[in-house]
């Protein structure tokens, strides 16, 4: 989500759970595995193709193009999210394989939608309805916020790396706990590993 949108969600959070692991399995359909090599270590994702096919196709397509390689995590909101996927590093850019912004995939019957924004959830960041490109965020805590952002995956390995990214010193931009890392945290390489059926 872009900064103006995310801060609105932050203000309506009614509580944070103290979950210490990643979310439980949420999909029973086709999934895609992703490896993100960062300057802090490796993060592995499972993408929910059955829940959000267009979003997953976009992420996979961009990864195969090498788009994410060298991009930073441009935003950290302590206890909430880390955010990346913008080649400008500002939170105002992005790209999609469709050549334009694309629509949300918010299906109330999808398992991931029902699960909500749990620790380890991977979802699309945007500046409003149907404005998705390449920016995404990873949840640091369970947050009961409105389901306005397409959930398309979860962290399966490397949540400790996500936490280490979240722990770095930031340049505050939206309060003392929300801003850009003082030292760039880079996605060195994003790789599509395999496809699997669950």
Task: Show where each model-derived region lies.
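Cyclophilin-like peptidyl-prolyl cis-trans isomerases
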Residues: 2-3, 9, 15-198
């Amino acid at each position: 989500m872009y900064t103006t949108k995310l801060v609105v969600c932050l203000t309506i959070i009614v509580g944070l759970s103290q979950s210490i692991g990643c979310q439980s399995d949420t999909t029973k359909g086709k999934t895609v595995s992703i490896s993100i090599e960062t300057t802090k270590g490796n993060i592995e994702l499972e993408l929910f193709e059955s829940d959000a096919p267009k979003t997953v196709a976009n992420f996979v397509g961009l990864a195969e193009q090498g788009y994410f390689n060298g991009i930073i995590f441009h935003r950290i909101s302590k206890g909430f999210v880390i955010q990346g996927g913008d080649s400008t590093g500002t939170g105002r850019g992005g790209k999609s394989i469709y050549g334009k912004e694309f629509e949300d995939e918010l299906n109330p019957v999808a398992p991931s939608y029902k699960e909500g924004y749990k620790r380890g959830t991977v979802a699309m960041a945007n500046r409003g309805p149907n404005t998705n490109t390449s920016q995404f965020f990873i949840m640091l805590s369970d947050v009961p916020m409105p389901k306005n952002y397409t959930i398309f995956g979860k962290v399966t390995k490397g949540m400790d790396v996500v936490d280490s990214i979240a722990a770095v010193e930031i340049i505050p931009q939206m309060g003392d706990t929300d801003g850009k890392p003082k030292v760039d945290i880079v996605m060195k390489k994003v790789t599509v590993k395999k496809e699997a059926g669950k």
